[in-house]
């Protein structure tokens, strides 16, 4: 996450916006397909597995597309961007790291919100025939049992695994550059995290993916809706906390972050 001029920052913004757009289109699109009424796929078996794998596919093609626009992009997640920003400041500080972080965050939120708005437009007939809580699930996450401590730790640990996996995958790709395309291991990493943790909290592991789409839900004209704002801070603060903690731990380790 190093930038030499404002032009690179502009391409970084576009890459993160489009990459995050693709992530949400795939992920929340899959949730809509298996949950909204009047969808031909709403009776699909293995809904949870379908959604988990489709989120993974969203990561794969979001990262691939972002990297095609600007090499080194494809975070699609403020927690990952925070990790790389802090780690970069510790090991190789440059003037544009933090402006790049802010621009990336804005792009990720905007990409998520545009994607969710697009899904709502495309599926409006099905959405308007479905109960508000099910519609909420195609926007953002909610816990199966509300418990602040356990919900926070679930999202925190899941995000630690996500970012740690991203770092490990980056090292593998650096040492084996022609092995698999960028984002391929992210597909299985994200799918695995959702399968392991998603039943408890929905596995947001991404503030833009959760808060940006929750805002869209709040702005959508649906009767008797509840965006569950009392929970909304957990999928934001827990992933960012994981990014902060891991960046400090790895930042002072001798191993380079690629």
Swiss-Prot record:
The organism of origin for this protein: Mycoplasma genitalium (strain ATCC 33530 / DSM 19775 / NCTC 10195 / G37) (Mycoplasmoides genitalium)
Membrane association type: Multi-pass membrane protein
This protein's encoding gene: glpF
Pfam families: MIP (PF00230)
Protein name (Swiss-Prot/TrEMBL): Probable glycerol uptake facilitator protein
Annotated localization: Cell membrane
Motif (NPA 1): 77-79
Catalytic activity line of the entry: glycerol(in) = glycerol(out)
Function, as annotated: Mediates glycerol diffusion across the cytoplasmic membrane via a pore-type mechanism.
Main location: membrane
This protein's GO CC annotations: plasma membrane
């Amino acid at each position: 996450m190093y930038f030499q001029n404002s032009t690179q920052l502009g391409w970084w913004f576009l890459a993160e916006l489009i990459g995050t757009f693709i992530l949400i289109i795939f992920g929340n699109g899959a949730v809509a397909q298996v949950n909204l009424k009047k969808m031909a796929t709403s009776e699909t078996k293995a809904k949870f597995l379908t959604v988990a794998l489709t989120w993974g596919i969203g990561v794969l093609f979001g990262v691939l597309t972002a990297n095609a626009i600007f090499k080194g992009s494809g975070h699609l997640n403020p927690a990952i961007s925070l990790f790389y920003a802090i780690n970069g400041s510790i090991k190789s500080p440059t003037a544009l790291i933090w402006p790049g972080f802010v621009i990336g965050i804005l792009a990720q939120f905007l990409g998520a919100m545009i994607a969710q708005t697009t899904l709502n437009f495309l599926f409006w007939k099905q959405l308007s025939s479905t109960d508000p809580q099910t519609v909420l699930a195609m926007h953002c996450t909610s816990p199966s049992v509300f418990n602040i401590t356990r919900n926070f730790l679930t999202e925190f640990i899941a995000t630690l695994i996500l970012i740690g996996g991203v770092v490990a995958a980056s090292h593998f790709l650096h040492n084996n550059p022609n092995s698999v395309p960028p984002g391929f291991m992210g597909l299985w990493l994200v799918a695995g995290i959702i399968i392991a943790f998603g039943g408890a909290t929905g596995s947001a592991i991404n503030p833009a993916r959760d808060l940006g789409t929750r805002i869209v839900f709040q702005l959508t004209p649906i009767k008797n809706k509840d965006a569950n704002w009392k929970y909304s801070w957990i999928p934001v603060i827990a992933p960012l906390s994981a990014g902060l903690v891991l960046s400090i731990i790895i930042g002072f380790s001798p191993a380079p972050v690629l």
